[in-house]
């Protein structure tokens, strides 16, 4: 049992863990976590709030989050919204008050399990129903999530560098190389790093053909990482 936070509802997915001390907004918005419930081992989550610039995708694909302690009050000059409100805004169900490190040990020893978490202020959970939802969920094996999270249309990345305290996210001029990035669930920060090297980046869908890509006459081609079963996305390569 824990305390519900974020969006009020129920989420079923593969329970994984993350040991990072910082970057929770980037982690939760990373498309690689599509279909997963993230268990954070670091106890103090939320201390820098959230902002409109650090998301790794234009949509949050994570199913849910699990924290050890209550969300920390934000204290950061870039913070625009506290994490609890941000989770509500993005419809992410969360639980706090769990022994996340013991859960991590279980995941490490037994493998990532299917799981369901539920946030209901009235306490009307229906445990049997939640268990059935978990058992019926097919899991990520054989699941192609690249098609779900990938861009549907080709677009040109606007060319902001990685963030610095002095300049924030700065736009790049005088681009020297053209890179085609195939989007299997690409993170925004990867695109920013290409901009650091003065690359003009064209992002294409995961099912773009070789002819489509070569027609753009790129200096290089980048295949991103992404969520789901790698065996199910091999067909695109």
What are these regions (language model features)?
Residues 215-237:
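Cysteine-nucleophile active-site neighborhood
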């Amino acid at each position: 049992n824990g305390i519900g936070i974020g969006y009020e509802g129920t989420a079923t997915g593969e329970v994984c863990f993350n040991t990072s001390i910082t970057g929770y907004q980037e982690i939760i918005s990373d498309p690689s976590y599509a279909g997963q419930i993230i268990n954070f081992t670091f106890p103090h989550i939320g201390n820098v709030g959230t902002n409109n610039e650090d998301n790794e995708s234009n949509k949050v694909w994570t199913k849910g989050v699990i924290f050890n302690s209550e969300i920390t009050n934000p204290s950061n000059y870039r913070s625009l919204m506290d994490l609890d409100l941000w989770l509500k805004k993005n419809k992410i169900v969360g639980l706090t008050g769990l022994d996340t490190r013991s859960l991590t040990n279980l995941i490490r020893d037994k493998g990532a399990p299917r799981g369901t978490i539920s946030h209901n202020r009235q306490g009307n959970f229906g445990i049997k129903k939640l268990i059935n939802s978990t058992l019926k969920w097919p899991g990520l094996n054989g699941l192609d999530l690249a098609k779900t999270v990938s861009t549907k249309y080709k677009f040109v990345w606007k060319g902001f560098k990685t963030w610095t305290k002095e300049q924030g996210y700065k736009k790049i001029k005088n681009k020297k190389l053209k890179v085609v990035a195939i989007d299997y669930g690409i993170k925004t920060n990867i695109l920013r790093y290409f901009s650091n090297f003065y690359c003009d980046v064209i992002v294409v869908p995961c099912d773009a053909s070789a002819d489509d890509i070569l027609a753009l006459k790129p200096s290089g081609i980048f295949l991103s990482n992404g969520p789901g079963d790698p065996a199910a996305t091999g067909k695109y390569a």
